[in-house]
Amino acid sequence: MVQIVISSAGAGGLAEWVLMELQGEIEARHSTGLAGNLLGDLHYTTEGIPVLIVGHHILYGKIIHLEKPFAVLVKHTPGEQDCDELGCESGTRYLVTALIKNKILFKTRPKPIITNVPKKV
């Protein structure tokens, strides 16, 4: 039988993340990829509607509550140093760092923000 040890972060409570769902594809300008880079600005209107601004485009979305929340896990495999201090009988552990209970769905096409483009003279 396989046992997976999962523990939570403690009494401080877990962070709550939000999942963002976009239609289509997002490409980076450079070949470095999107990891670790700023995607855009997320704002909320006074009515609570999420607004995502990416470059010169704006997207309007809606918040959807997930029926089954997701847990964000961090895998911790004990190294030789951990084995000496704590003993190696426990094996791999997973730590719950955050919960995802809501997602923001952007299902419409992005609208351009720039309205007037200067013409060449």
From Swiss-Prot:
It is found in: Nucleus. The keyword Cell cycle applies. Disulfide bonds: none annotated. GO terms for molecular function: DNA binding. One of its GO terms (biological process) is mitotic sister chromatid cohesion. InterPro entries: Ctf8 (IPR018607). Pfam families: Ctf8. The keyword Cell cycle applies. Keywords: Cell cycle, DNA replication, DNA-binding, Nucleus. Its main location: nucleus. It comes from the Eukaryota. One of its GO terms (cellular component) is Ctf18 RFC-like complex. Belongs to the CTF8 family. Component of the CTF18-RFC complex, which consists of CTF18, CTF8, DSCC1, RFC2, RFC3, RFC4 and RFC5. The CTF18-RFC complex does not interact with the Rad9/Rad1/Hus1 complex. The CTF18-RFC complex interacts with POLH. CTF18/CTF8/DSCC1 associate with PCNA. CTF8 exists as a dimer with DSCC1. Chromosome cohesion factor involved in sister chromatid cohesion and fidelity of chromosome transmission. Component of one of the cell nuclear antigen loader complexes, CTF18-replication factor C (CTF18-RFC), which consists of CTF18, CTF8, DSCC1, RFC2, RFC3, RFC4 and RFC5. The CTF18-RFC complex binds to single-stranded and primed DNAs and has weak ATPase activity that is stimulated the presence of primed DNA, replication protein A (RPA) and proliferating cell nuclear antigen (PCNA). The CTF18-RFC complex catalyzes the ATP-dependent loading of PCNA onto primed and gapped DNA. This is Chromosome transmission fidelity protein 8 homolog.
